[in-house]
Amino acid sequence: MSKVIGIDLGTTNSCVAVMEGGEPVVIANAEGSRTTPSMVAFAESGERLVGQQAKRQAVTNPENTLFAIKRLIGRKYDTEEVRKDISISPFKIVKADNGDAWVEARGKMYSAPEISAMVLQKMKQTAEDYLGETVTDAVITVPAYFNDSQRQATKDAGKIAGLNVLRIINEPTAAALAYGLDKKKDEKIAVFDLGGGTFDISILELGDGVFEVKSTNGDTFLGGEDFDQRVIDWIADEFKKDQGIDLRGDKMALQRLKEAAEKAKCELSTSMETDINLPFITADATGPKHLTMKLSRAKLEALCADLLNKLEGPCRTALKDAGLSPSEVDEVILVGGMTRMPAVQKRVQEIFGKVPNKGVNPDEVVAIGAAIQGGVLRGDVKDVLLLDVTPLSLGIETLGSVMTKLIEKNTTIPCRKSQVFSTASDNQPAVTIHVLQGEREMAIDNKTLGNFELTGIPPAPRGVPQIEVTFDIDANGIVHVSAKDLGTGKEQSIRITASSGLSKEEIDKMVKEAEAHSAEDKKKRELVEARNHADTLSYSTEKSLKEYGDKIGADEKAKIEECLANLRKAMEGSDVEVLKKATDELTQASHKLAEAVYAKAQAEGAQPGGEAAGEASAKDEKVVDADFEEVKDDKK
């Protein structure tokens, strides 16, 4: 079995790791960074940029630079969370035919899994460059509080990226795996994970290689992006008060504000005050305007007070569901970049009554845990058992539009539960079952997973047919449904009408497009490498020709000059094969010139070298020994 990579697909940044020699290793990307911005941009030239390249040009291309797409994955367009995102996004969020929230860039619509797949492809490429081999198997992490649609959409993203997703694993569980792999004692831990876009809290019991999740809770729309937005709004309001200009109407200025807000927030984790300087932020009739402000840590905490207050509720619920008091938790592990904020750490300390553990790298620990889980699935990591839970209850709509729960939240997965249903009227040929996920009492307030129609029921009085419906949650937390007529013993045919998500045809189409892009990217890379090689060769040949051109014949010199001109012309084009051919021709033609350069170098080195050789032969061996001793002394 080939290597299994672990990918932390984050809202703001992503990270990839792999097991090497029994140890997890975080892989640096082509830019040398261990995390990659989860950003995708479409340039005017049609080129697709991912990661750091996309982030660098965001200010000048705000409408076509897509970020925080994880907050849209598996979500409907007509939801409160998406509406909130639409109001602050510089890029267009549009409604797809199936009702999902998609994005638009350069006039083309993309699904959230498709954009996420582009980030995953970048992570896959990073791993392949490091390992020197093709990678297909992966473990991808998701927030623990992701529902079925969001998990399925993440799995679809992996498929589009050309990955075989062996397992979808919850981020706090992955972090616990990384933290507790070498721990020998039994302990109860809380993993507090506040990232760029999501918040999770999981309570686990660790001991003897068993990682058992007792409860999980969270908010899939609370993270660093929300804290940044508070700072952006404050800067924009202050500037409007001072200059009378609202920067929110200028997408380019808004993108600069976003970068400045993120930078200021990060700086205030280590200092009490920071300067925000944005020269030439805008202009009016009086001339250009510059933005200069000071932001203190106290002000930042005041701006984000309500966001900080939102952290407590899920923690209290998770503790209650696990049947533990805060004092019974041995360690609180901090995960996610936002946990570097002192106010967050203080709030965690207040909730749990203990100083949180900062022993793990909050940006990398989730990817490390995913790589360890990959090692478990591959058989490289022994004696580790992971018992995760389903974050949300699963049930169906019953009489009076009430949700009847079949599988309660925090049930260990994989799990299976069956329930017998019957008909509501005489001779009813079909039953429609509305499957729901959530914690609310009424069906309308929960998330619809699908409507399952059981057809071909034999004519019978109401309440007589016995139809057993089985709900199954797999190890990825993804729901499956099957049905059986107990009267006939036959499996009933179920037609599933997915409420959202991508169809198989759409996924297959996106897989093909992703493969085409991958081949295109490879060609571009080949062209860049060929151009670089050609540029180096033409420069060195031209230099050598100036210095040693008189050492070769006129015909040979003319031939080299001709090949040099051909290579320069080929470098202007974009045909790799033509470029390689021109490079080879110049290399062949330059052989005589290379010989002349080499001969001159030898001649220059031969005279002093010859004298030294003569001296050495004229002296006895002791001198050679002394010479050898000197070298050894130098080394010391």
UniProtKB/Swiss-Prot annotation:
Top-rank taxon: Bacteria
Acidic residues bias: start-end ranges: 626-636
InterPro entries assigned to the protein according to its UniProt record, in alphabetical order: ATPase_NBD, Chaperone_DnaK, Heat_shock_70_CS, HSP70_C_sf, HSP70_peptide-bd_sf, Hsp_70_fam
Keywords tagged on the record: ATP-binding, Chaperone, Nucleotide-binding, Phosphoprotein, Stress response
Molecular functions (GO terms): ATP binding; ATP hydrolysis activity; ATP-dependent protein folding chaperone; heat shock protein binding; protein folding chaperone; unfolded protein binding
Region (Disordered): 602-636
Protein name, entry field: Chaperone protein DnaK
Organism: Geobacter sulfurreducens (strain ATCC 51573 / DSM 12127 / PCA)
Gene: dnaK
